[in-house]
Amino acid sequence: MSQANITTLTLRIDWSELDLFGHVNNVAFMKYVQAARVNYWEQIGLYKYYTERKHGPMLASTYCEFKKPLFYPGDIMIHSQMEFIKNSSFGIVHQIYNSHEELAAEAKDVMVMYDFISLIKMPFPEDIKKLVSI
């Protein structure tokens, strides 16, 4: 991941996120990715864009590849970055690191820009595209 346009979110692992085997459940990883996704939207202005215009991202797909288990107690750090921008869709890659700075998982989201009033997809906003120039 290059250093351009990366956001970082640090979260504390909660004991309730553990599964029968004593490590963080896969569902919790997706919760972490959701938090990182929204944090990224806020940082690049997409959340504000939605609140002002009711135009915003809608999740089309999400994927996570697990590399190492996570354990309690501990913190995680999630680095998120724009992977691609097409006409109306875009992708974000998230890298989840454990307390030892080891890559625990990599997740990818594909989203579609959506007009929540007209209920149709729409082009990715040019002003935000310039901010994240990939």
PLM regions and their residue ranges:
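HotDog/MaoC-like acyl-thioester-processing domains
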Residues: 3-9, 70-72, 83-134
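Hot-dog-fold acyl-thioester-processing enzymes
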Residues: 2-61, 115-134
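Hydrophobic beta-strand-centered segment that forms part of the acyl-chain substrate-binding groove
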Residues: 40-90, 104, 112
